[in-house]
Regions:
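Aromatic- and glycine-enriched glycan-recognition loops and surfaces
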Residues: 2-3, 47-51, 89-106, 273-281, ...
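A glycine-rich, often tryptophan-bearing local segment used as a flexible ligand/cofactor-contacting loop or short
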Residues: 325-401
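A short helix->loop->beta-strand "cap" motif at the edges of active sites that frequently abuts
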Residues: 112-113, 161, 344-347, 438
Length: 527
């Protein structure tokens, strides 16, 4: 703290101090050959020390055992269903980190400077979507933008004066070298993130790295100038209002709000063959016209009426992981709450192995609700006759090719009465089912693409009985999207591709007009 005060005194010209997420580095281990061995951007294992363990015992009233962190060698990564002791440790660390960080922020303010945090590598204890974060008193948060999901990681943060996104590419030699193409990377990054910005804008944009490297790429500088101008117009038109949301969607997993937009990430926007089919759901939602929230099973146990203002619940991931819940489905309160929600008219979308956990004669614990089950070998003795496909369904109406399910799922079969939309080699990849007054959709996987984003959009509308509102603030071409800012009296149409596009655009009153768009173009209109 003394060094911080000294720095402030010796640098009066500095008016913003940007902290690199304060104290604890995420879990990162290397092997004897200096290769990365283990990485977990959300890991807490690097925050353990004798002092911390002593303080934990005093506050919580029980000893912290090594196994609470080691966790059979899985180190409680975010795919593991968190136990009580690990969640206690996380909450303890958040309180401890918040107290220390507040001291630093208070000193910063006393010295007449703003305090900004770079949300990233030292994020332990400073997760912005928990209540402790607001007590720190930060003025701003900045973070790296890799895609729409990581943009929403930043823009959805509450309790700060402004948020900022650091866009790619970084001004490093791996991109800015002879023969490099920084413009291509910049375009991909901006167009990908723009979808999310149009739903929840950050307040500022920027880049990082060695500035002098960019001087040798004048075409890059010109493109960045165009991005800045586009962002200014976007921000001016969208600020101060929530864009039109057609439905309210909740992503249900073991983490809930604390992992908002970050679920299915091992590291920041890092591709994994095993999870891209699930991460695509979150990426699609980041720029879709829905009011999205993230809820946990603990939230349901605390308040089973939490779903009262929700239209559709999504449970996505592999069985027995934190993303689908694992053994939590043995708790009758959880399964009853979801069944009641759907039976009374709610929508449910299960992706991968939703509610997957072998228990009481089922692998998918909501198999009766979803109308689909996984063949684990225990039911091979039962014949299965429901394999007919129903391709002329509302959900598939805009598809132009066979649906890309990514890795898909093997050994999924449908119960009688379930309507199969897609099965391949007698393995169900997509199906719909009625349950009481409600509806469910099963999808084996859905990597992010514009066409798959449209499939998810229609799935949400169908499961929520929302077919009638399809042609409101809507583009018939799935490569083009419409966002309406009704309070501000404006709406925009955006081409997400690098090619010209034609589409029919529907306004909020279902009137329409034809439109031709240049690559990447965004057009603004008065309502």
């Amino acid at each position: 703290m003394e060094r911080l005060r000294k720095f402030c005194e010796e640098h009066p010209y500095v008016n913003v101090i940007r902290y690199t997420t304060f104290f604890h580095q995420f879990t990162l281990m290397f092997d004897e050959l200096k290769r990365e061995k283990y990485v977990d951007w959300y890991g807490y294992s690097a925050s353990v020390s004798p002092y911390i363990l002593e303080q934990f015992e005093k506050e919580m009233g029980y000893k912290f055992r090594p196994e609470y962190i080691i966790d059979q060698g899985y180190y409680n990564n975010q795919y593991r269903v968190p136990g009580k002791e690990y969640k206690d440790f996380q909450a303890f660390q958040r309180r401890e980190v918040a107290k220390l960080a507040k001291e630093m922020v208070d000193i910063t303010h006393e010295c007449g400077k703003e305090a900004m945090m770079f949300w990233g590598d030292h994020g332990i204890g400073t997760e912005p979507f928990r209540e402790e974060f607001a007590t720190i008193g930060l003025d701003a948060v900045v973070g790296s933008v890799g895609n729409g999901s990581t943009l929403r990681l930043i823009s959805d943060i509450e309790g700060v004066k402004y948020t900022e996104g650091r866009f790619l590419p970084y001004f490093f030699p791996d991109t800015f070298h002879e023969g490099g193409d920084p413009v291509k990377e910049a375009k991909e990054n901006w167009v990908t993130a723009r979808r999310a910005i149009l739903r929840k804008p950050i307040d500022r944009i920027g880049y990082g790295g060695y500035l002098k490297l960019a001087l040798d790429f004048p075409e890059f500088l010109d493109y960045v100038e165009s991005v800045c101008n586009e962002f200014r117009e976007l921000y001016e038109n969208a600020k101060g209002t929530t864009p039109y949301c057609v439905k309210k969607v909740a992503v249900l997993n073991s983490w809930g709000k604390i992992r908002s937009w970050g679920c299915h990430m091992v590291h920041h926007a890092l591709y994994q063959k095993q999870n891209y089919s699930y991460a695509g759901i979150i990426e699609a939602l980041s720029g879709a016209p829905f009011d999205v929230k993230f809820i946990s099973f603990d939230d349901i146990l605390k308040d089973k009426d939490i779903s009262k203002d929700i239209d559709v619940i999504i449970n996505v991931g592999d069985g027995d992981t934190a993303h689908t819940g694992g053994a939590v489905w043995e708790n009758a309160v959880i399964s009853a709450a979801i069944r009641e929600f759907v039976y009374q008219g709610g929508g449910f979308i299960g992706v991968g192995e939703p509610a997957g956990h072998q228990y009481q004669g089922h692998y998918l614990q909501l198999a009766d609700l979803i109308g689909v089950e996984k063949e684990t070998g225990f039911t091979l003795n039962y014949d299965k006759y429901n394999w007919e496909e129903h391709k002329n369904h509302f959900i598939l109406a805009d598809t132009t090719k066979p649906v890309d399910f990514g890795e898909g799922k093997k050994n999924m079969f449908a119960y009688e009465g379930t309507e199969i939309l897609v099965q391949r080699d007698k393995e169900v990849q997509m199906a719909v089912h009625e349950f009481g007054e409600g509806r469910s959709v099963y999808i084996s996987g859905l990597p992010y693409s514009f066409e798959n984003s449209r499939i998810l959009y229609r799935s949400i509308l169908w499961s929520a009985h929302g077919e009638a509102v399809l042609n409101q603030w809507f583009s018939t071409n799935f490569n083009v999207e419409v966002h309406a800012y009704v309070k501000n009296g404006k709406f925009c149409v955006v081409n997400n591709t690098y090619e010209p596009q034609k589409t029919t655009v529907y306004r909020g009153d279902k009137s329409s007009f034809e439109l031709e768009m240049a690559p990447n173009e965004i057009k603004w209109y008065m309502i």
